[in-house]
A protein has these predicted regions:
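Basic polyanion-binding and macromolecular-assembly surfaces
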Residues: 1-40, 46-352
């Protein structure tokens, strides 16, 4: 049995002038890589966008990360026994589980699946006082996003879930320099003899071709969700990673784009981030940045496979420019093939 199975996602995506992820001063986030400044989008920002995409799919079991965990349990209690004092029972259920809560909510954000909230509610309605049962109810039945992104509970590490997915900070394949947009706002009801602006301001932005990378530990995921749901979850993760985008300043820039090229691999050794393809920044040229970035990614991947890393067990590409790595498919065909490949691999490993 091969206990290692990873799905790596590599995406090249061009975004126009935008500020989709900004720092505490309002500037687009950046990073120095290869000695030059790059545009950067944090992994947290893209994971939040992915979780929002999950929530839009009614077929997916998505959890809630909130300080109002008592409200989740309360809703389940009301569904089971509306005549009971749901507020009191929900707070007591969390207390029995070791999760501190008051009228303002839990002390920290708590990640809970619908199944876990329902299990706590059932124990509360039954009148159980066994604290171990309440704690155990939070240790099983994670939602798919909890299994992917993990859960950390500082007060009770036994409730932690290891994340099966890792998402890298996206960086531009080339050097960038932030720019400023000077804007004004005019008062629509202002007198005609006072034509000046009522508000002046600036917004900082940049544009870039981003290299985006994420990996999913399939065996870890299957251990938490089971083989069938793990395969479905890998597909959902891939779809969300391909098509989601953080929403920062989206009304100002309308910057929602789709990937230029996608490369997905099924690996049986370890995850391999191919960001090294862009350690030397792609130079400015008449071709733009997307085309030479594709060439650099393909060349670097082949170099890695001929020297350090084994070639992937299976590879898939979407879009043009990476056909040397695998035949190009549509996004839907690739996701279908990926789900089947993961399902078959888990079946071969006899993971239930």
């Amino acid at each position: 049995m091969n206990k290692r199975l990873y799905v790596d996602f590599h995406i090249l995506q061009t975004v126009p002038p935008s500020c989709i992820n900004r720092d505490d001063t309002g500037s687009p986030k950046t990073a120095v890589y290869g000695g030059v400044t790059r545009a950067r989008v944090s992994s947290q920002a893209w994971k939040h966008a992915m979780r929002a995409a999950f929530a839009e799919n009614a077929q997916l079991d998505v959890g809630k990360r909130t300080k109002k965990a008592a409200e989740l349990v309360k809703a389940q209690i009301l569904a089971l026994a509306p005549e009971l004092d749901a507020d009191k029972l929900a707070k007591k259920a969390l207390e029995n589980a070791g999760i501190k809560s008051d009228d303002k909510g839990t002390k920290a954000l708590f990640f809970m699946s619908t199944a876990q909230a329902k299990a706590l509610a059932e124990l509360a309605v039954e009148g159980s006082a066994d604290k171990k049962q309440y704690r155990d109810a939070l240790k099983v039945a994670p939602s798919m996003d909890m299994a992917l992104f993990g859960r950390m509970v500082a007060d009770d590490p036994s409730l932690n879930y290891d994340a099966a997915a890792q998402v890298a900070h996206s960086i531009s394949t080339h050097a960038v320099q932030n720019e400023y947009d000077y804007f004004t706002a005019v008062d629509d009801c202002q007198a005609e003899d006072n034509a000046g602006a009522s508000h002046l301001g600036t917004v900082e932005y940049n544009s870039s071709t981003l290299y985006r990378y994420a990996t999913v530990n399939v065996m870890e995921l299957a251990g938490q969700l089971g083989a069938a749901q793990a395969a479905e979850t890998v597909r959902a993760f891939g779809e969300a990673f391909l098509f989601s985008m953080p929403t920062g300043k989206q009304n100002t820039f309308a910057n929602r784009t789709l990937p230029d090229a996608v490369y997905v691999t099924l690996r049986e050794d370890q995850p391999v981030n191919l960001c090294g393809a862009f350690e030397r920044a792609v130079p400015r040229s008449a071709q733009g940045y997307a085309a030479p970035s594709k060439a650099a990614l393909a060349q670097y991947a082949q170099q890695m496979y001929s020297s350090f890393a084994e070639a992937p067990a299976q590879s898939f590409t979407v879009g043009s420019g990476l056909e040397v790595l695998a035949p190009a498919q549509t996004a839907k065909a690739m996701l279908d093939a990926l789900e089947k490949a993961v399902r078959d691999a888990l079946a071969g490993n006899e993971v239930g």
